[in-house]
Every structure is written in C-alpha cells, then in structure tokens.
Curated annotation (Swiss-Prot):
Keyword list, A-Z: DNA-binding
PROSITE patterns per the UniProt record, alphabetical: SAP (PS50800)
Similarity annotation: Belongs to the UPF0746 family.
Species name: Dictyostelium discoideum
Keyword DNA-binding included in the entry's annotation: yes
Protein name: UPF0746 protein DDB_G0280785
Length: 972
C-alpha cells in the first residue's frame, strides 16, 4: 500500500501541471491524482505527514503547519479545481451549442461585425473611450482642484475608503469597468473588506457581486494580467465560502454559489474544513438567514447543525426598536431553523423518560401559537406598518381593518413543527378586523416560548421576558406591573428607570394612574424596593416626559411635602434646584413658558447673572433669550466649562447679544484656546471656530500647534478652517516671513532659531463670503456676513476684545505651513518657495519632517508626488536626495506603478534612480539596500505588479531577486 502511494506521489510530481482533475474518473488518469483517489488512498489519520507535504508542494501549495491543516489545504485545492472544471465545461458546452446554432443559420453575403457592450448604456461607451485615453484623461483632470482627493489615485479598499465615501461601491464599479492598470482592488484582503461592507440584499448589490466575480475569475478576459494570478475566486472556493459566512454576508454568499454553480457537496466540505461549528452557535438575526439558506440547499454538514442558541442575545430578537417586518422575519427564521418536534423526541430518548410536564406544556403552547399565526392573513399590514418600529406601532395601535397593499395574491402564514417547516407571508384581499397589538403579542409570545424550549428549559431562572413585554402586553394596573419589576428584575436601577419612563410616556395609560404612581413614590409606598438615593431616577423620568400636567402635579406634591417638613429635615431638593438640575431635558418652548409663568421666582435659570442657562438645549436658546430680555435679566458666561460640547456655540451666541449676556474671561483663556479649537475641529464644528475668530480678537496670536498632532486624522475636517486661515495670505507674504528665519539661521545659534512663523489673516466682506460658500458645501451650519462682522462696537472682556475683527494673527510651524499649502492645492506656491528660499525649506531641521513618510504619505497623490520627484531630480543636492528617496518610498508603498513606469521610460532618470550604485556606476544615487527597501515596501503593501516590475528592471544580484520573489510567494 505504501509503495503504491509512493508511485502515485511520484506521478503527481511528474504530471501535476496537466489539467485533468475530473472528479468522476474511477482512477488515476494519466498518472494524475483526483479528488476521489485522494480521499480513498490518503486518509488524514493514516497517511504519513511527509507524504502529505510532498503532495502539497507538488500542487504548488504551502506545506507548513500541522498534519490536518496540510490535509485540509490539499482537499480544498481539489474542491476548487472541481468547481473550476465544472464552470469551464459549462462554458465550453455553451460555446459549442452557440457555434452549432450559428452554423445552422443562413450566412449573409457580406459579414457585418458589431461590437456590443454588456450591461453598458450607449452614452457610457463614450465615457469609457475618454476615460481610457490617458492623454485626454490627464488633461481633463488637470483642470480640477483638490487633485489629491481624486479617486483615480485610490489604492486598496480599506475601512477608511469604504466607510468614508458614500459612493464607494460606485467608485469600485467604475474602476473595474475601466479595466486600467490602476486597479483599486489589489489583493484578497481588499475583497474581504468589500464583503464585510456591502451586505444589503438588493438588485444593486447583487449586480455588484456578479460583476466582481466575473472580473476576478480564471475565465475572465478583462482582468489585467498582473492581478489574475493573485485574485481568482474559483481558485480558492472553500476559503471564500468561509470568509462570506464569517463576515455574515448572505448576499455575497448567495451570488457566489449561483455564479460559480457550486454544488452542495463542495459547500459542505468547505464549511466542514474551514468554518467552526461555533460560528452558528452564537446566533444572530443575519446568521440565521445564512443558516436557513444553506439548509434549504442541503449544504449544512452534520457537524454544523445549529447549536441550541446557547450564546443568543434574546433582547436583540425582541427589541421594541426593531421594525415590525423584522419581528416577523425573526419568527420565521427561528422556527425554520429548528425542528422542535424532533428536538422533543431527542430529549425524551436522551433522558430515557418522558419529558418533564412543564417543558411539554411549553412545547404545546408554542405549537398552539404557531397554529394561530398560520391563520393570520397579512393584508391588514400596510407598508408603513411593516416599516414602523414595534414601539411606534404599540403607541398608536387601534383595531385595524383591511388596507390597500401592493400585492394582490393570497396566502397565509404557514408553520408546522414537521421537518418540512414552511412559512409564507403575502397579502390577501379578505376583509378582517384584527387588533395589531394582539398580532405583535403573538409573535413575541412565540419567540419567547421558542427560546425557552430551545435554551432555558433546563434552568428556568435564567429565562425572563423583556420588561417591555410586560409593560406593553400585560393588562394590569401600574401597581401590579411595578410588583413584576421588583419580583422578576430584583428592582435594579436600570429597570426602575425603564419602568418609570415607559409608564409616564405611555399615551395609552390614563393620567390618573400616572398621578397615582407619582403620589405612591413620593409617599414612600415603594420604600422597601426603591431606595431614597434612587429618587433621581424617578425625578428624571418625570421631567423627561415633558408633560406639563405631570410636571405640574409632581412639583405641587413636592411643595406640599416640603411644607409639612421642618426646616432641619429636607427630604427632597428645593423646587428651583429640581428644575435647574433637569432643565437640559426640556425639549419644547411650552415647557419654558410654563416655568416662566408659574415658577419664575424659584427657577435658577431665570435669575440675573445665572450660569445654568448653559444647560438649556441650543434649539431653545432664542426663545429663552426672549424671556430673559423681557424681564431685564442677563446670563453670565465664563470659561470654566470650556470643554463642554457646545461651549463655543454658546460663546458665539453670547458675543452677538451683549444685551442678554455678560462675558468675563481672565488671562487663562489663552491657555485653553488651543484645546477649544482642537475639540471643535474633531466635532466637525469648523464654522463655530470661524465665527469666533471673526467676532473676538485674541490679545495673543492663536497657536496652531494642534495641527502638529491632529492634522492627519482630521484633514478633511480641517480643510474649511485652513481655507479661512490662508484665504488672503499670499506666497510673497510667506516668503517675507521665511526670510526672517533665514537671517536667524545665518546669524544665530541653532537653539535661537525659531522654526515657527507668525502670519496675519485679514477678514473682509469678500473673505467672509468665500468662507461661507465653502462651509455651506461641507457642513449643515451656514455662516453669513452679518453674523461674522457684528457687533460694531468693540468691548474688552479680559483676554478677548469682542467686536468686529478685521484681522488676527496665528503661529504655525514651517512643516505644517507646507502641509496646509499642499491641501489648498497651492503646490505651485510651494515650488515658488523652494526656488526662492532653498536654504530654509531644504534645511533638514524644517523640511525633512514634511517629506517623512508618515506625513506626506497621508496627503500625497500620484500627480503631486511625481511633481515633487521631478523637482528633486532637477535640483539634486545633499538634502534633496533624501527627500527624493522618501518620495520614491511613498510611491512604492502606495502602488503608484505609473510613476515608476515613467522613470523607467526615461533613460537618464532610470540610470540615476533605479540602478544600483557601484564602483563602475557612480552616477546612480542609491545602493542595493536602499533600492531593495523600495521594492520591499511595494511587496508589504501587496502591490505585486509594481514589485515584479522593479525586480525585473533593477540590476539586483540573482540571490537578491530570488529572495524578493520568495517574499511575494509567501504573501500570495
């Protein structure tokens, strides 16, 4: 037996390159090992580990890892080959059939050839003709601003790109269709990110995945040659099935199976080898959809039967924030996934006794509920109802009659406990009067019973229905429901909060019952279960209801209780403190008016010079100002809570209305100004900063050290602010400031050199308008000329001068000055400054940081990067050679292949840049190690097309070339 295996292995080594892996063959055809022969003769347990390694190597597979891993790798290879052969055979048969049909058709006297484009609109053909013409393409895009943000430079589909661009799918589709050398998708990790991102089950997403599979398969003729060897779905079928299941993407998995016509046995094997059984144990709504789908096409291996929902979060299925249609689908997926009748029988056999009477009772209840739901027709559900949340439906439920629906077919919910469970939900024209709340309750009850029978029957203590289930479906008094909270939920603070808020906001509960609840809490009826220090939970529930009647009743009862208490014993806070503590919950003007008319003397936020106004929601500030102005009172603002989220917005409001606000800042405000700018940039509040700087003059220059640490993460958020800062700053004024640095460099020691410069931003009506236009495009807040340039009179308030600001100063480092100019598309100005002041800008202490990889990598485009490279080549010196090398490293890391192709096409540049410096070639700039590092960066970034281009062109030794190629093979 061993000798026979040895012969087979030798045959593999001699013949494995031949493509004859037909799974239906009875033996080894022409000496080749087939899937059946492999499974028959090479058992994972008895086969020698060394023999498996030889087979793996002969097939071009990795041979490292444990024995079972190597075995699974070989098995997966054969499964993929089977799918590929089936796909090829199908296409061959279709081509032969098509050829026969064409031969049978009468031949025209003169042949006419028509080029057709599948799935492409006629007008789109002209677009692609322009798009693929590099000369026209570059000419068009050279006229666009913000070239560094052009999508044609995007390399790789990472989370930043996929989540940061709302049209990321369209960009990928355009890039695939363009079929140019600059492909966004570079490797399998990019594909995995795509699978993790696009999961919606609609026609657009399904079409997207079909395009993806057609381009990245071994039969594709459109794919660039360099990518076809690294990404082929049909060469790695089992691994892609694993990735789609683990990323819980039903749409991709469904289209993948259909596109490549993968049979159930291949899917079963792939799941068994690569997907852990526990994946389906932690059951979610979306995982259930995949599980039921695989089950419906008979593709679930016996080892992966759905575990009994051990790690399932019941609250996710029963959330009242879910849409009604999701509740129906949850019910469907749960019931379809499990044969409850079979589970009952298995439990009886396992225990060798009849099932516990209580458990049997629950199974019977569930069966009864399923039968009841089978009788429900869904014609009374409108699209609005199906797309509404359960919470909203329960707050507006009335008996509903039959309503118009988009479908006219008739069927019912059909569910049984038999192995052939079936469920359909369509519409019927039958007239019906059914209470929607009762229907929702039946679905909830069924899901609860299902989980109890499947998971919690062995330990009833662990099972409890959500609190909202009792609050919405149990027809009990408020007192009775509160007892349930205490008995079933042990009276936790969170449950008390949920209970009080739900009761007080429920429009279906009578006001008298709510009044009774308030009275019972204040009279200590629940003192044993509701501690006094937890009263703030109840207070918050009352004020958050924003119900004037409830709040008024509550405050009057508090007042009565306080009158009955001695001065030394004050159980509850004062009325004024209560209202002030919860004023942030006020969400409508009527509540403010209510306090103003009835509790003005008690309310702290109606006092003169109060600071509590900062807690009132910004949407209500204008009405609040009107009330304060009507009684001649003012609010106070200092910088004590400068880090609050809306502080700068409130400061801008206060600056514009000095009759209502008094502002007082001492010298410490200069210290916190940087943090204020930083926090508002992170919160996308660039307009708030611009408003502030336009209406308040700092007595010291604004330091922009924040740019040093925060520029990279917040580049797009800062763009409007940067435009505002540099709008009226010319390159000549920057040159003047840099000349001062140059003088200091010549005459002072290094320690005395100040690497920062101070610039002045001039504010004019034109500046304001420009800023406003830009801001309007990028944010929802609009800024007008009027509110930027008022008030007219200046006023000193400590370290600030409030009033119309004509200009302000700021300091910025030379490095960040260059970065800002770059992001404003003022690269021509950078080149101008290079020429005028090379001794300053090319000073390693200043400029080297700008060209460091971590800085320029995040902002560079191929367009500008090539511009810098060409400039450094034309101005080579001891400093610029280092900057040139850094730019080449970035181009390699980002996969800008065209930059290197342009260098190679130039005989002079290629000799300087991409040939190794030796004794015989002193004209070259870089030694072997530096050039090797450039190639390694492209390999580590999985840009293999560029890697192979550089390996072939650079005159590395044979040893170095082999070493680099091995790095590529390991990452493929």
């Amino acid at each position: 037996m061993i000798s026979n295996k040895r012969k087979e292995i030798e045959n593999i080594n001699r013949h494995h390159e031949k493509d004859n892996d037909d799974d239906d063959s009875d033996g080894i055809d022409n000496g080749l090992l087939t899937y059946k022969k492999f499974k028959k003769d090479f058992d994972s347990g008895s086969t020698n580990y060394r023999e498996l390694q030889i087979i793996a190597k002969s097939l071009g597979l990795a041979s490292n890892g444990k024995k079972q891993l190597v075995y699974n790798r070989i098995e997966g290879y054969f499964l993929s080959k089977k799918v590929k052969n089936n796909l090829t055979n199908n296409e061959t048969n279709q081509q032969e059939e098509k050829k026969e049909e064409e031969q049978q058709q009468p031949q025209p006297q003169e042949k006419q050839y028509i080029l057709t484009f599948k799935d492409v609109e006629p007008v789109e053909i002209y677009f692609w003709k322009v798009f693929r013409n590099i000369v026209i393409f570059k000419h068009i895009f050279s006229n666009f601003k913000n070239k560094q943000y052009g999508y044609y430079d995007l390399i790789g589909c990472n989370g930043v790109f996929l989540n940061g661009k709302s049209n990321s799918m369209e960009i990928i589709i355009d890039n695939i269709k363009s079929n140019n050398n600059n492909q966004i998708i570079r490797n399998k990790y990019n594909i995995t990110n795509i699978i993790n991102k696009f999961k919606k089950n609609d026609e657009k997403t399904r079409s997207f995945y079909n395009l993806l599979f057609s381009r990245y398969s071994s039969t594709s003729t459109s794919l660039p040659i360099q990518l076809s060897s690294t990404i082929q779905f049909d060469e790695d079928i089992d691994k892609w099935i694993q990735r789609m299941i683990e990323n819980v993407n039903f749409t991709a998995l469904d289209q993948f199976i259909k596109f490549f016509k993968i049979d159930s046995e291949v899917i079963k094997k792939a799941i068994k080898i690569h997907v852990k059984p526990s994946v389906f144990g932690n059951t979610t709504y979306d995982k259930l959809k995949i599980y039921n789908y695989l089950k419906s096409i008979n593709s679930i291996p016996t080892s992966h039967k759905l575990l009994p929902f051990i790690s399932t979060d019941l609250s996710a299925f029963l959330s009242f924030d879910n849409k009604f249609k999701k509740l129906i689908k949850s019910y469907k997926r749960l019931i379809e996934s499990t044969n409850l009748q079979e589970r009952m029988e298995q439990q009886e056999q396992k225990e060798k006794i009849k099932i516990h009477p209580n458990n049997k009772k629950y199974y019977e209840k569930l069966n009864q509920k399923i039968l009841e739901l089978n009788e429900i027709q869904t014609s009374q559900f409108t699209n609005d109802q199906l797309n509404s949340t359960i919470k909203n439906l329960l707050n507006h439920t009335t008996p509903t009659s039959t309503s118009t629906s988009t479908s006219t077919s008739t069927s019912t919910l059909t569910l049984t406990l038999t192995p052939t469970t079936n469920l359909t939900i369509t519409t019927s024209t039958a007239s019906n009067n059914i209470n929607l709340k009762d229907i929702i309750k039946k679905f909830y009850k069924s899901i609860c019973l299902f989980f109890y029978c499947s998971v919690y029957s062995a330990n009833e203590r662990l099972f409890r229905k959500p609190l909202l289930y009792y609050l919405n479906f149990k027809k009990e008094s408020v007192d009775k429901m509160y007892e349930r909270v205490v008995n079933k939920w042990n009276g936790r603070s969170f449950d008390h909060q949920l209970f009080f808020q739900s009761i007080l906001k429920d429009i279906n509960i009578e006001k008298n019952e709510k009044f009774e609840l308030i009275l019972n809490v204040l009279d200590n009826k629940y003192v044993k279960t509701f501690e006094e220090y937890d009263h703030y939970i109840f207070f918050k529930a009352v004020f958050s209801s924003n119900d004037i009647e409830l709040i008024d009743y509550f405050l009057k009862k508090i007042k009565q209780l306080q009158l009955n208490q001695t001065q030394k014993i004050t159980k509850y806070p004062s009325i004024g403190k209560l209202i002030g503590d919860y004023c942030h919950l006020i969400d409508k003007k009527e509540i403010l008016d209510f306090y103003f008319q009835n509790y003005r003397d008690e309310c702290l936020f109606f006092k003169d010079q109060n600071e509590i106004w900062k807690q009132i929601q910004l949407e209500l500030i204008e009405h609040y100002e009107y009330l304060m102005d009507s009684i001649g009172k003012r609010c106070k603002l200092d910088f004590y809570r400068w880090f609050d989220q809306n502080f700068l917005d409130r400061l801008n409001i206060a600056i514009l209305k000095p009759s209502v606000y008094s502002i007082g800042f001492d010298g410490y405000f200069d210290i916190v100004s940087e943090g204020l700018v930083d926090s508002n940039i992170k919160d996308n509040k660039e307009n708030s900063i611009i408003n502030f700087l336009s209406n308040a003059q700092l007595k010291h220059p604004l330091s922009l050290e924040i740019f040093e640490s925060s520029f990279n993460p917040y580049t797009s958020k800062m763009l409007t602010f940067i435009k505002f800062l540099f709008n009226n700053i010319s390159k000549e004024s920057i040159e003047t400031k840099l000349k001062v640095i140059n003088l200091k460099t010549d005459n002072k020691s290094f320690e005395e050199i100040n690497s920062k410069i101070e610039l002045t931003t001039t504010l004019t009506a034109t500046t304001t308008t420009t800023t406003t236009t830009t801001t309007t495009k990028t944010t929802t807040t609009t800024t007008t000329t009027a509110n930027l340039l008022s008030p007219k009179k200046s006023k000193d308030v400590g370290c600030l001068t409030i009033g119309k600001t004509e200009s302000f100063n700021f300091t910025i480092s030379i490095r960040m000055l260059l970065v800002c100019l770059y992001n404003l598309d003022r690269v021509d100005d950078i080149i101008y400054l290079f020429d005028k002041l090379p001794e300053v800008l090319f000073n390693p202490d200043y400029f080297s940081i700008f060209t460091n990889e971590y800085c320029i990598y995040g902002i560079s485009s191929s367009y500008y990067l090539e511009l810098f490279i060409n400039y450094f080549i034309a101005n080579i010196n001891d400093n610029t050679i280092n900057y040139l090398y850094n730019c080449l490293c970035i181009a390699s890391k980002k996969g800008y292949t065209q930059i290197f192709k342009n260098i190679i096409s130039s005989d002079q540049n290629s000799k300087y840049l991409l040939k190794i410096q030796t004794k015989s070639n002193q004209s070259s700039l870089f030694n072997s190690k530096l050039l090797n590092d450039i190639v390694v960066k492209s390999i580590n970034s999985l840009n293999f097309e560029l890697s192979n281009l550089l390996i072939d062109f650079i005159d590395f030794s044979a040893k170095d070339k082999n070493s680099l190629k091995m790095k590529i093979l390991k990452l493929k």
